[in-house]
Regions:
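ATP-dependent carboxylate-amine ligase
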Residues: 1-51, 55, 71, 222, ...
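Adenine nucleotide phosphate-binding catalytic loops in nucleotide-utilizing enzymes
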Residues: 9, 13-24, 203-337
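Phosphate-binding loop of NTP-binding sites
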Residues: 10-12, 16-206, 211-216
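Short glycine-rich anion-binding loops that position phosphate/pyrophosphate groups of nucleotides
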Residues: 83, 132-134, 153-156, 188-190, ...
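A generic structural signal for short, well-ordered alpha-helical segments in conserved domains
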Residues: 88-92, 292, 394, 435
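Buried hydrophobic packing segments
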Residues: 91, 95, 114-118, 288-298, ...
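Short, surface-exposed amphipathic charged segments that create phosphate/polyanion-binding patches used
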Residues: 118, 164-165, 214-225, 416-423
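Residue-level signal for inorganic ion chemistry
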Residues: 130, 151, 184, 287, ...
């Protein structure tokens, strides 16, 4: 593929572990202070974390603030359709072992959120930043990242996002403008491989692809891709480095991975490390090996990065356990067919299941994606459909042959489920709203 492997140990430690920060000009400093004040006011008024409004104010006063705040830092941009927030937290845990960092832990992943994260840590020499895939090109041009992490590319928010192939093409053009950037990319996702193109510093990772519904045909030429196994499941749960490949007659093919998973260990040609991820499911093994490869690319020694990944158990409320009366809720997020494909390996039969679907702007108004989720695999457990689009979800569950109840209000839906363990899977705004309601409920009781 014309790429150069970056060694597991990353760049020379002396060059990487002591990044130098440039001093900001007085106008940028004033813009940052105005943004911080706006964020503080937002929090004081109970309007949220303030990261979006704070970044927006800073950018309104200085449209070059993102570039100026990033200058002199070792910046890692983490992007893709699914797994950004989790992988971002895993990389941040590893990078913290070598120095302070800026980190958009809340998941505010567009320009205003990125500016706010950088402004909150003005002296940090590192930045580990989640970026919405639609905004990756513009943010990469502004910050000139040391590392770009590309997890996967699938359909999401059909009314907001353009066609996946167009997103991949935009990313490919952006990466071509940054030839010195290390691109840590998922070799198992044909759309990602197409997006990386001929980037000269690619590190390929066998991170898995639980959903390939958007790439039955080649992203480049449109011909049918050939997979070496019938169920086209590759990566952590399958063929490791090279047993389960894909290719097209045009020449686009799965690159030979530089990192892969074998018997629960992260492997390179010269590295073998236990991959101790405390997040559930095969999908998080893939996120873990992506995080480890990325941390090494920014200069963290592999044997120092790997143990740090164990620190991550909850990610912005995801995977958290919440006790509510006699129920124990496990909070999970899935927002598109690819996310659900990975989630199915995490759900524990016959644990009762609450599925909550909204369709606001942040979720995407179009819920037709529900028909691509294999809900048929959720049989033999109590299921309740909830959320603002509970009726749409209920229709899909009926066609899947699942006995279920439809209860629009999530708290009322929980009351319809038995005591004990309950898995809760919600899309973005439904997940956020339920967390807030449960928090207010606990505060009122205690």
């Amino acid at each position: 593929m014309g790429t150069t492997m970056v060694q597991a140990s990353g760049l020379e430690p002396a060059a990487v572990l002591h990044p130098r920060r440039r001093r900001l000009g007085w106008w940028t400093r004033a813009a940052v202070q105005a943004g911080l004040a706006a964020a503080a006011l937002s929090r004081m008024l109970g309007l949220g974390t303030g990261s979006i409004i704070g970044g927006r104010v800073t950018l309104a006063l200085d449209h070059r603030a993102l570039h100026r705040l990033a200058a002199g830092r070792r910046v890692v941009l983490v992007s893709g359709t699914n797994g950004k927030t989790t992988t971002n937290h895993l990389i941040a845990a590893a990078v913290r072992t070598v120095g302070p960092l800026a980190h958009n832990a809340s998941g505010s992943n567009m320009s205003d959120g990125v500016v706010a994260a950088l402004a909150d840590a003005p002296d940090a020499g590192y930045a580990v930043i989640e970026v919405d895939e639609l905004h990756l090109a513009a943010i990469a041009d502004a910050v000139d990242p040391m590392v770009v992490v590309l997890l996967n590319l699938t359909r999401d928010q059909l009314d907001r996002a353009t066609e996946v192939g167009a997103i991949a093409a935009a990313i490919r053009r952006a990466l071509a403008r940054h030839p010195h950037t290390v691109v840590v990319a998922n070799a198992d996702d044909p759309m990602v491989v197409s997006a990386v193109g001929t980037a000269p510093r690619a590190v390929w990772v066998a991170a898995g692809a639980s959903w390939l519904g958007d790439v039955a045909t080649c992203p480049r030429c449109g011909h049918i891709l050939t997979f070496t196994n019938s169920d086209v499941t590759i990566g952590p749960g399958g063929g490791g480095r090279g047993e389960q490949d894909w290719e097209c007659e045009c020449g686009l093919a799965r690159p030979t991975p530089d990192w892969w998973i074998e018997d629960g260990k992260a492997c390179t040609v010269d590295t073998l490390l236990p991959l101790e991820i405390r997040l559930p499911g095969q999908i998080n093994l893939g996120n873990g090996v992506m995080a480890l490869a990325s941390a090494c690319a920014v200069g963290v020694p592999a044997d120092q990065a790997a143990p740090a990944l164990r620190q991550v158990q909850v990610v912005a409320g995801r995977y958290a356990t919440v006790h509510r009366g006699a129920q124990t809720l496990r909070m999970l997020l899935a927002k598109n067919p690819a996310g659900w494909a990975g989630m199915l390996s995490i759900l524990s039969a016959p644990t009762p299941l609450l599925v909550i679907i909204n369709a606001r702007e942040a979720d995407g108004r179009d819920t037709s994606w529900l028909w691509d989720v294999p809900f048929e695999q959720l049989s033999s457990r109590p299921v309740v459909a909830s959320g603002e689009r509970a009726a749409d979800l209920g229709v899909r569950l009926s066609y899947a042959g699942l006995e279920h109840q439809t209860v629009s209000d999530p708290l009322a839906a929980l009351a319809a489920l038995p005591e004990g363990a309950v898995d809760v899977v919600a899309n973005y705004t439904a997940f956020r709203d339920l967390r807030q309601r449960l928090s207010r409920e606990r505060q009122a009781v205690g």
